[in-house]
Amino acid sequence: MSLPKKKKPEVEEEEKPEEEEEKEEEQEIDINNLEWQNIATSNAFKVDIGDEIIFKPTSEPKQVKSGSAFVVDAYVYQWKSQNQVPQKGNATLYIQTVLGNAIIRAVQQYGLGNFVVHAKNKGRAKGKLYYDYEIKIAKVKQ
């Protein structure tokens, strides 16, 4: 015994949703005929193993897409490194989670711009999955 097939109700063609219309409009832009303006270019400097850095964060740390590190803007006072890094001045730092979390806690406790960080990346201990840092934070007297 078989069941009779139900007829599909006849539906009038509906209007396209607004999202689809917006997508079509976006595709019509000719990127070759746009006038581009340079806003900024930047390099992020990584705090490597053995590096010792003293800096004042000028922005809150922002977590990278993978969640394994942070990026923070800072004023660097001193950077001891084997690599070529900025010795003094503004820089964008690529820092590991341990240091990023310490900066977040310091921002919550002291407020942005009210402290200086002294960090030393000691590297990984044998058999460990994480990096060891020596982190000191000093409140700036106002």
UniProtKB/Swiss-Prot annotation:
Residues 1-31 are annotated as: Disordered. It comes from the Viruses. Residues 11-29 have a biased composition (Acidic residues). This is Uncharacterized protein ORF142. The lineage of its organism: Viruses, Adnaviria, Zilligvirae, Taleaviricota, Tokiviricetes.
